[in-house]
């Protein structure tokens, strides 16, 4: 049977998506599925999440609650990150066959190294480090060459009513948010078992 692919709609600006990335990284090999991360800018969902605005106390409290539940240590940024260029860059990385390396590097840069992922120089340096042509990367991101792909990701997420961060698509339905690894293991394993039991076309 072909490997089961689970789409995950995310944004690098979301601390909860960083936590999800950490948990998915542990479960992907264990459960044998492939994650398909698709960037959707959180700033397009709510004006409260625009780059540079401070995270509201209610958002910080929610993040602290998830950190406590999941045990994933992370310091949320004081202000919403500017992730637009990084998301477009992820589509260039996908095209270059380097999505996983780029994706990992951007999450680490934003949440572990406190690098400004809204800075094109920083993004280009990351791209070059993982083997992407830096000149093409810079030029494409600067001109918004992948904006249409990011817009298509949002339209696709909307079709599933996947408006939260992160959103896992399990069949036709979104699982919104991130749970402790034990809960995620149970939910994803149950979905994979159901899929494996379905008649193959």
Task: Mark where each language-model region is.
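C-terminal cap of thioredoxin/glutaredoxin-like
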Residues: 2-33, 38, 108-201
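Structural alpha/beta surface segment adjacent to cysteine/selenocysteine redox centers
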Residues: 18-113, 198-199
């Amino acid at each position: 049977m072909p490997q089961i692919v689970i789409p995950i709609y995310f944004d690098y600006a979301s601390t909860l998506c960083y936590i999800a990335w950490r948990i998915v990284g542990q479960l992907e090999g264990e459960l044998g599925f492939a994650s398909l991360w698709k960037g959707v800018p959180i700033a397009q969902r709510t004006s409260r999440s625009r780059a540079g605005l401070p995270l509201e106390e209610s958002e910080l409290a929610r993040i602290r609650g998830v950190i406590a539940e999941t045990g994933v240590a992370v310091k949320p940024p004081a202000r919403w990150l500017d992730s637009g260029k990084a998301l477009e860059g992820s589509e260039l990385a996908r095209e270059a066959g380097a999505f996983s390396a780029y994706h990992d590097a951007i999450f680490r840069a934003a949440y572990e190294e406190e690098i400004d992922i809204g800075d094109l120089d920083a993004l280009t340096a990351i791209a070059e480090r993982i083997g992407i042509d830096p000149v093409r990367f810079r030029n494409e991101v600067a001109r918004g060459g992948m904006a249409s792909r990011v817009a298509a990701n949002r339209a696709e997420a909307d079709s599933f009513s996947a408006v939260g961060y992160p959103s896992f698509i399990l069949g036709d339905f979104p699982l919104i948010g991130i749970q402790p690894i034990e809960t995620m293991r149970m939910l994803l394993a149950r979905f994979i078992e159901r899929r494996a039991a379905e008649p193959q076309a």
